[in-house]
Every structure is written in C-alpha cells, then in structure tokens.
C-alpha cells in the first residue's frame, strides 16, 4: 500500500511540474475559451462591445474597460474553430504623440519591474522603423518562453491621435493557432 501511495505521489508531482504555464493579461491566463475569458473580464468591470466585435470579424472580440487606471479598448484574439484564446491587445488613446510619451515610458518601466528577467528589444513596424518594444516573457525556470508583450505607439484605431498598444500573446496557444490555421493549406 505504501508503495502505491508513493507512486501516486510521484506521479502527481510530475504532473504538477509539467503543467503548462500561460501568459496572463490583467491577471487572467490567456488560455481556455473566449467565452470563459470574457466572463473573467466582465468580473473585472470590462464590457463587451457587440458592434465593434462584429466589425472586427471572426476570431476577435472587442471590449471596453479600464487598464492601468485609464479608459481602454481591449481586443481578444481567439481561434474561430475551437474558440481558444491566444492573445489580448489593449489600446490606450491619446490626442498627440507628446501626450502619449510619458504614459509610454511609465508602461515600459512597469513592465520591466513586473518582468525583471526580460530585456526589452526594439519592436519594428512593417517599414522597419522602431515603433516600440518587445518583451519575451520567460517561464518560472527562465528556460522557456511563455509568451511575449509588444508595446507600440501607432496611429489610433479611431483615426484621431495616437495610441499605445500592448499586445499580450501566449506562446503555446499562439503556436496551436498557427498549426490549426496551417491545416487548411
């Protein structure tokens, strides 16, 4: 009996050690279905924007809420086939580049404090210009990446002013998404 209990204990330890760690957005793991993720956002006071979600198309749901004490637009990306969440983008809008400068620097500093084991790298836009920073987020051991955060300053989605975009992506679910999309090839 002791041998069986010992074996079960070792198996439980192995399962716990191999449990996948996921990237988090607003304290919510970027994992599970979009419906489950939406409920967790709702519990944080975030509201669903049906009109913007419909305009965004399949694989994206749009929400409005607060992020770092500011009004924000939150877009959650998921795989339409199985509704698995893999990314969340927060947009903070400002009237001018100058008005976004200090918040951008403050966000950079906050990310560096929260993730001290990562060094931000330049985030390049499609034309090769630097538009922000990229943070590769390691797991607890520091051996593997659980995801990445892209911080960018770009024209606002509203067409007025500029926005700081923070894109949180879970590496494991992003790779699953790519595999599912590539099944169509």
Where are these regions (language model features)?
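Short acidic-hydrophobic surface loop/beta-edge motif
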Residues: 9, 63-67, 135-137
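Mid-chain, structured segments of secreted extracytoplasmic proteins
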Residues: 61-107
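Short N-terminal signal/transit or membrane-insertion segments
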Residues: 4, 20-21, 82-85
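N-terminal cationic amphipathic segment used for targeting or macromolecule association
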Residues: 14-17, 86-88
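Non-cytosolic coordination micro-motifs
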Residues: 20-56, 92-185
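Sterically constrained small-residue positions within well-ordered secondary structures
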Residues: 10, 67, 79-81, 124-126, ...
